[in-house]
Amino acid sequence: MFASLRTLVSVGLGLKRLLDLGRAPAPDAADAQTLELLRRADEARQAGRRDEAGTLYRQILQSRKNHLGALRGLRDLAAAAGQWSQALEAQQRIIGAVGSSERSPETEWLAVVHYELGRAELAGGHASAALPHLKNAVRADRHFLPAALAVGDAHETLGEHREAVRAWERAAEIHGALPLLARLERAYRQEGRPTRMIALYREALERAPDNLALAVALGRVFFELEMLDEAADQFEKVEVQAPDLPVVHAFLGAVFERRGERREAFEEYRRALRLGHAFDWPHRCDACGAATPVWQDRCPACRRWNTLRPARP
């Protein structure tokens, strides 16, 4: 009986060795040759030797077709060169290879690639071709503001005003971002809907009551609608929380000037000029901390997408 058991164990171990030999290595198995190729490829990419880096990354993928380091390297090379179709191919392979814990950063990258493809089509006057990419970007990451804005812009370019407004309104349920609200405000102004303009910012403020940028925007809308008392009240509320905000004093000066209160207007203008950047609301990058006077789709310092937020005073 014991001899039979030993025989079974021996046969089982033999089968296991055969199966192990036939099994493909894990995609990112850290063998010395792959690590050395990856090191050389990354070094070449960082030194600007793009062709050499690309050759080395592809060499890795010949034996390990789902190697994440090589795929990400090819994606980054393509993105740096503005070759977004190639970046998309690499990114789709990455999405297929990563585990669920890594999926979120990679879906953000997928949104970036689709956005850049759509943006290029839009800049070339091909709004119809841009829309599928821009919508794919929003599907990949619904918090990716540049794509949400551009979907509506593409519809507007095509003369599809209602579709543009619907796209921005859907996005506004997720984002309380000033560039998005500004587009909706412009659309409501064109439609002659002043109460909707006011409600737009009031609703956004209800969702984010500490957002002073939204509070100032509401005051600006009151001012532009000639609701001077409401505008003054709104700006004075903001002034209590942030007395050194130049934009508040610039608008208060304009309110007083419209009322004919020249001395008070002069004083507010003087304070705004002393503090600087009178009618601008500065933004700051969440990733690197760089400041910019206005919102942009990418940080001008670190070049990351969708990272600029209204700066807190």
Q: Would you name each region that the model predicts?
A:
Residues A26-P27, A97-E108:
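Flexible helix-coil transition and linker loops at the boundaries of alpha-helical arrays
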Residues A24-S63, A79-A80, V113-A129:
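Alpha-helical segment of the N-proximal tetratricopeptide repeat
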Residues K65, G99, R142, H175-G176, ...:
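Short coil turns that delineate tetratricopeptide repeat
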